[in-house]
Amino acid sequence: MDLLKSMNRALKYIEENLTNDIDFQEAAKLAFCSEYHFKRMFSFLAGISLSEYIRRRRLTLAAFELKDSNVKVIDIAIKYGYNSPDSFARAFQNLHGINPSKARFNGHSLKAYPRMTFQLTIKGGNEMNYRIEEKEAFRIVGIKKRVPIIFKGINPEIASMWESLDEKAINKLKELSNVAPSGLISASTNFSEGRTEENGELDHYIGAATTKRCPDNFSRLEVPASTWAVFESIGPFPDTLQEVWGRIYSEWFPSSNYEQIEGPEILWNEHKDVTSPSFKSEIWIPITKK
């Protein structure tokens, strides 16, 4: 409940500064968390990125102002953070489907995105199995690719990464594994802004957690010493896993005393048989106490 109140305080600050430069660090302070965690929590709770929410709100208010006043288009563009009439017109057209000058006349349909507030919804109260782990610094060694974000079903780009690993490479990675999570793992990091809108990208690794030197033919990701929240997922793949991932942000973080810090989100699978109805996975997320 306190988290929702603090998030709404941050939203109030953003709403009051839609015609100014928004200080995201100040918004995060009002939410009693880091800027990184604030943006991630907002995205998962709202279903869109913070920057996209701000863009929609500004263009909503701009449409109202165009409709209800005689203020010049260039003045409205500058007021809502656009440096030129052209950039404003493109953004306006993309959202509303018409150019700003036509919005002044009746008969045109415009989109409105109301101010957002977060409210508590009581759901089924299904348990979540998790543990907290402290880990020294290590590195993830393996193959790396920039891939699109996909919410539902199998990500074909990630599937192709797995297919590219021959038996020799898999055995080499398993030999490198000497710290938990053991064996082959996946890791996602460097998420783009569109993470929650399924139009962003991320850096995806398939490899091993290790303290050993990275061979020349593999990529590596250095991971600093961190505290990790480890969540268990048991059920049909990938639906159960994707459900747990969503609940981590919509349920666990809001009710915990932790916030996420920058670092990779790691996935460990018990075995390769994804057809098992009791497929077991673990999600590792780097955290810190608030």
Curated annotation (Swiss-Prot):
Note whether Transcription regulation occurs among the keywords. Answer: yes
- The signal peptide annotation in the UniProt record is none
Which keywords appear in this protein's UniProt record, sorted alphabetically?
Cytoplasm, DNA-binding, Transcription, Transcription regulation
The record's listing under InterPro entries reads:
AraC_E-bd, GyrI-like, Homeodomain-like_sf, HTH_AraC, HTH_AraC-typ_CS, MarA-like, Reg_factor_effector_dom_sf, Tscrpt_reg_AraC-type_HTH
Gene3D superfamilies in the record: Homeodomain-like, Regulatory factor, effector binding domain
Q: Which residues form the HTH araC/xylS-type domain?
A: 8-106
Q: Which residues bind DNA?
A: 25-46, 73-96
One of the record's GO molecular function terms:
sequence-specific DNA binding
Gene Ontology process terms (BP): regulation of DNA-templated transcription
One GO CC term, this protein: cytosol
Protein name as annotated:
Uncharacterized HTH-type transcriptional regulator YdeE
| Underlying gene | ydeE
